[in-house]
Design a protein with these regions (language model features):
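Structural preference for beta-rich elements and adjacent junctions enriched in aromatics
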Residues: 20-396
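Catalytic-domain carbohydrate-binding cleft regions of carbohydrate-active enzymes
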Residues: 172, 189-191, 262-264, 269, ...
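Bacterial Sec-dependent N-terminal signal peptides
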Residues: 1-23
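Membrane-spanning beta-strand positions in outer-membrane beta-barrel proteins
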Residues: 79, 169, 181, 240, ...
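Exposed, low-structure sequence patches enriched in small/polar residues
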Residues: 351-353, 359, 428-432, 438-739
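Outer-membrane beta-barrel transmembrane domain signature of Gram-negative proteins
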Residues: 212-235, 375-430, 466, 557-610, ...
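Short glycine/serine/proline-enriched coil/turn segments at secondary-structure junctions
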Residues: 61, 164, 182, 415-418, ...
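Short, glycine-/Ser/Thr-/acidic-enriched flexible segments
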Residues: 85-86, 115, 197-199, 246-250, ...
Length: 739
């Protein structure tokens, strides 16, 4: 998460400066053949437009003499060359060889909005080692869902670096066909940003002059990139064909009558994914026998506050393309469409037969259509999972200004003797002085429910957001969710309520470390949620959290907070087999503090602790996440999340643990892997996963994956639990043909 925040903040904040420069810069086509070797002082780079940089942190607006970037193109590729001088080259942070890894290395990030949509961008980052990291930005950086900043989005592109006695340099080569350029007035227009960091100095620089210090937090995104024109560039249609072959050997246990029976499952499968640019503005994706065997397993979570649902991020590649287009904010951390409802049923994977997705623009409207069919699964004595069709339709149209839109979404989940349909309207309205109004309304219909009632089957969300990070800023929201509202393809944090939310904050930046201890401080005076029943007869939940956070000039940050909370339980909440909060009214309070180290350190030890009353007793919550970097080839990431709950009236207490250790290794830029071990004390299971990837080049991979879960206490039930529930070893080969 830290890597996403750092790269996003760097790209986003700098883009305000681009907005101040309205002149379109002409990028000329190269007449030279650029050899991708990481050197930018070669003859082939002469004559290209050179962008200069200005410092963003810690000293605002100072000119930077250490960094330059050049951009050009030929018939097939966009090229970027960056010269990043370093007076102390031995201090370059260079410890990442993993694709999409992040360990606090120095980086160069190139963001491009291919058609000056002023909403969407692709970000290509490279580290001194040559390791690469890419992501997509949607909705102009306005967080409408989990896909606004999407680090799981992978592109086919190349990058090379060189480290010298003067610093380091990088060259990019990005296929034109992957960028979906569209000619307007016989020109190709785009927006760009470039960021360079020197993390040992906690320093970052950007192209072009910088904004005033009082800037919005995340609004200055693609809408304020530097406008450029690619003179003489001709768009190329996108065509990618990715067949795969897969073999797996596995076994699982299922309960049959009076015992657990083992079932072996050995498979050989094949499938194909196709991406085709129907027009310059419309892209069609087709997937047959869709597979996600190489996707890393989810982190284990214990839901102590199990009055809310747990949101897990989408990691599967098929759902990453234009994922932000399908974001529909249905309220606090809630979505009308949640892609993890497809192919995952009650935590169990169900095969996807295939599907299609169409995304792009029709006239000035963003359009998206998605439809997938899952296979039915026979579970023996546990019943079966029916084959289902999942479909989504999405429209969005710009109104008022570049940062505002109105939209429509419809979802439909269909299986034998059942359907669930949802429709909704949403919008984002950018108002003066960094103020945003974000409304949505949606309604659902499903078979075998009570008669449709507009209020009971609907949900309304209204959000007013002052999007700043210094000075005074605030958020205010209202949300209503009817008793029968149930989006079969969505995610709801909470259901059946009225909710009122408000926050009031004050932030302050300091540029001179000789005059202040903290580079940034923030006071949150109020951060409060109030939940009522749908008829306003009872308060369900109320809380207010006030906190202070400060970030030092070296990147270390500290937070302290206090919280009051009220809960009305109409039915007991069970945390473990021995811990249960009974029906009743509860008021509790707790305090906490946390420390997060600067990401430049080889050894990092973030820690968070809180303690206070908790229903009928107390809870001590502790979280530590140590990371140790052993150079470029090996690192260890660990986490320990613990809750010590004591209920004096029941004379019970228990420690609840979730422990995870992840070993990441990389022999070079092509061969890498990881080993993960996780323990969950509530389920009393230990989960293991090992993953090896040989990346010949982007789109050409071999994966070896092993997953298994172990039952630690097999005597929890009668008959005894099996040693494990599922075990599988998979080898997968895929190759992408593209032009």
């Amino acid at each position: 998460m830290i890597r996403i925040v750092l790269i996003c903040c760097s790209i986003l904040c700098c883009s305000y400066s681009f907005g101040q420069e309205n002149t379109e810069i002409i990028i000329k086509k190269t007449n030279s053949k650029i050899i991708l070797d990481g050197y930018v002082n070669d003859e082939e780079w002469k004559g290209n437009h050179t962008f200069l940089f200005h410092e963003f942190t810690p000293n605002w607006n100072q000119k930077d003499s250490l960094t330059t970037v050049q951009i050009t193109f030929d018939d097939s590729f966009i090229y970027l060359g960056v010269d990043a001088k370093e007076p102390e080259p031995d201090k370059i942070i260079n410890r990442n060889l993993l694709r999409d890894g992040w360990y606090g290395d120095d980086f160069i990030a190139f963001g491009i909005d291919p058609n000056q949509t002023k909403k969407n961008a692709l970000v290509f980052s490279i580290y001194p080692s040559g390791g690469r990291y890419d992501m997509s930005i949607s909705n102009d950086g306005i967080p409408l869902g989990d896909s606004t900043f999407n680090p799981s989005y992978d592109m086919i592109w190349e990058g090379k670096t060189q480290i010298t006695e003067k610093g380091w340099s990088a060259e990019y080569r990005i296929p034109i066909s992957n960028l979906r350029f569209v000619k307007k007035e016989n020109q190709i227009k785009a927006g760009i940003s470039v960021v360079r960091t020197q993390n040992h100095r906690n320093r970052s620089v950007r192209i072009l002059p910088l904004p005033p210090q009082n800037i919005p937090n995340a609004t200055e995104t693609p809408s304020l990139y530097q406008p450029i024109v690619f003179d003489g560039l001709n768009p190329r249609k996108q065509l990618q064909i990715t067949p795969y072959a897969l073999g797996s050997v596995g076994s699982s246990y299922s309960f049959d009558s009076d015992e657990y029976r083992k079932q072996n499952d050995n498979n050989i499968e094949a499938g194909i994914d196709v991406r085709y640019g129907i027009t310059p503005k419309l892209t069609l994706d087709i997937s047959v026998n869709t597979d996600f065997a190489q996707v890393e397993i989810d982190d284990q979570i214990v839901n102590i506050n199990n009055r809310v649902n747990i949101f897990l991020p989408e990691k599967r590649k098929f759902f990453q393309e234009q994922a932000g287009l399908f974001d529909f904010n249905a309220g606090v951390l809630s979505q009308l469409f949640y892609s993890r409802t497809i192919g995952i049923n009650s935590g169990r994977l169900t095969p996807i037969i295939g599907g299609v997705r169409l995304t792009g623009q029709v006239r000035n409207a963003d359009v998206g259509f998605l439809s997938l069919q899952t296979e039915g699964v026979n579970l023996g004595d546990e019943g079966s999972i029916s084959s289902e069709n999942f479909s989504v339709l999405r429209f969005r149209n710009k109104v008022l200004n570049d940062k505002s839109f109105v939209g429509f979404m419809a979802t439909n989940r269909l299986r034998k003797d059942y359907f669930n349909t949802a429709i909704g309207f949403d919008g984002v309205f950018s108002l003066p002085k960094s103020l945003y109004f974000i409304p949505s309304v949606s309604t659902t219909v499903e078979k075998d429910t009570n008669d449709y009632d507009l209020a009971e089957n609907s949900r309304v969300s209204l959000l007013l957001d002052k999007r700043k990070q210094d000075g005074l800023f605030y958020r205010a929201a209202y949300e209503f969710s009817g008793k029968q509202y149930n989006p079969g393809m969505g995610f709801l944090l909470r259901e059946k309520h009225h909710n009122f939310y408000g926050s009031l904050n004050y932030g302050n930046y300091n540029s001179n470390k000789d005059e202040a201890l903290f580079q940034y401080t923030r006071w949150t005076l109020m951060n409060s949620d109030l939940y009522y029943t749908t008829d306003f007869s009872k308060v369900i939940t109320w809380y207010n959290r006030s906190f202070w956070t400060g970030r030092l000039f070296n990147g270390d940050s500290f937070t302290v907070f206090g919280q009051l909370q009220y809960e009305n339980l109409e039915k007991p909440i069970r945390f473990t087999n021995t811990l249960e909060a009974p029906i009743g009214d509860y008021m509790f309070y707790y305090f906490g503090a946390s420390y997060s180290p600067g990401n430049q350190r080889n050894i990092q030890f973030p820690i968070a602790i809180e303690y206070g009353t908790f229903y009928e007793g107390t809870n001590l919550k502790l979280e530590i996440k140590p990371t140790i970097n052993f150079g470029k080839h090996f690192n260890i990431e660990s986490s320990w999340k613990a809750n010590h709950i004591v209920f004096d009236k029941q004379n019970t207490e228990e420690w609840i643990h979730v422990i995870q250790t992840k070993l990441n290794w990389a022999y070079n830029l092509h061969l890498s892997g990881s080993v993960i071990g996780q323990y969950n004390s509530v389920s009393d299971q230990f989960l293991t996963s090992a993953r090896l990837r040989y990346n010949v080049k982007d789109g050409h991979d071999i994966y070896l994956v092993y997953n298994q879960d172990y039952n630690i206490d097999r005597q929890l039930t009668t008959p005894n639990l099996p040693e494990y529930n599922n075990q599988i070893f998979t080898i997968k080969y895929l190759y992408t043909f593209f032009k």
